[in-house]
Amino acid sequence: MLFDQIARNKRKTWLLLLVFFLLLGLVGYGVGNLWLGSGFGGLILALVIGFIYVVTMIFQSTNVVMAMNGAREVDEQTAPNLYHVVEDMAMVAQIPMPRVFIVDDPSMNAFATGSSPKNAAVAATTGLLAVMNREELEGVIGHEVSHIRNYDIRISTIAVALASAITMLAGMARNMMLWGGGRRRNDDDRDGSSGLEIVFLILSLIAIILAPLAATLVQLAISRQREFLADASSVELTRNPQGMINALLKLDNSAPMQHHVDDASAALFINDPKKESGLQKLFYTHPPISERVERLKQM
């Protein structure tokens, strides 16, 4: 089952790349048509920006994500309890020892990042370390180590990179609309516009407006099942389902994180870091804690 999931995650990586780059291309086409005088030129520019974001995140994902979340690296001397739990879980999972970080925040949360098990990292908040006992902490870290072992972190890294690129490009386009409007075409340009070009332009304008939401929905589509699998994989590592259940119940009562969490990286956390309510719940990248607990009870 595990190796099948790893293979599926690798296939999802390519599908994720395709969906995000298609969305980037639409946004770029709209930007090019409206402001650069060439839809194709804008499309190429957007794809180049997306490629740069992905390459940067693949090689610098740990440093970038940790900096985004204000995490500091620790070792066996400065955080022995966390370090030893990560070390134990990595040994059981048969992966290289990840780098270990702490986020100074009173809420309870944790996440993993990196592009492969060889350059992965795990982070936990000070609030998590203060509240969780050893068994619960093992459950949480086992969950994050499972993301590393199952290659979920590669999907997450690419998702963060491309979602950030889409949000940045769409934000720039919307600001240009507000401040300057589109490039004015002369009558000859309008008369020569093909029906297909107009269709692409309309789709691009829609993409510019809805791109950040679409990026979130793509992350949502790939995130929820990964969380269920990581919960189950954590129990496989710890042989202690009750420890994972107790940890999830505590996470359910945690307050939102106090420091700002970028929308693109929110899906990395074991627990929703924003604790939003109302209609925003529809766009959670995490399944409900109650559902995760119920699945563990059925194991």
Curated annotation (Swiss-Prot):
The keyword Transport belongs to this UniProt entry's keyword annotation: no
Residues binding Zn(2+), per UniProt: H143, H147, E227
Entry-linked Pfam families: Peptidase_M48 (PF01435)
Membrane disposition: Multi-pass membrane protein
Cofactors demanded by this protein: Zn(2+)
Active site: E144
Species this protein is from: Streptococcus thermophilus (strain ATCC BAA-250 / LMG 18311)
Single annotated GO MF: zinc ion binding
Alphabetical GO biological process terms: proteolysis
Entry EC number(s): 3.4.24.-
Name this polypeptide is given: Protease HtpX homolog
Cellular localisation: Cell membrane
Gene3D superfamilies: Metalloproteases ('zincins'), catalytic domain
Co-factor binding comment: Binds 1 zinc ion per subunit.
GO cellular component: plasma membrane
Keyword annotations: Cell membrane, Hydrolase, Membrane, Metal-binding, Metalloprotease, Protease, Transmembrane, Transmembrane helix, Zinc
Stated family: Belongs to the peptidase M48B family.
Presence of keyword Nucleus: no
Transmembrane segments: 14-34, 39-59, 153-173, 198-218
NCBIfam families the UniProt entry points to: PRK04897.1
